[in-house]
Amino acid sequence: MTVCEGTRFSVLSRISPARVRVVKERRMRASALSVEEWYGSGDYQKSA
């Protein structure tokens, strides 16, 4: 995690914990999609 990301996270958590949760969910969904693309959707779904 870079300093910029840490600062953004602390600012977001001050604004609204619910918003942080949404951002985390979006990030997790995005990373899951990139992993799926990297390994190939069929293989990724089998392992998951």
Curated annotation (Swiss-Prot):
This is Uncharacterized protein TP_0607. It comes from Treponema pallidum (strain Nichols).
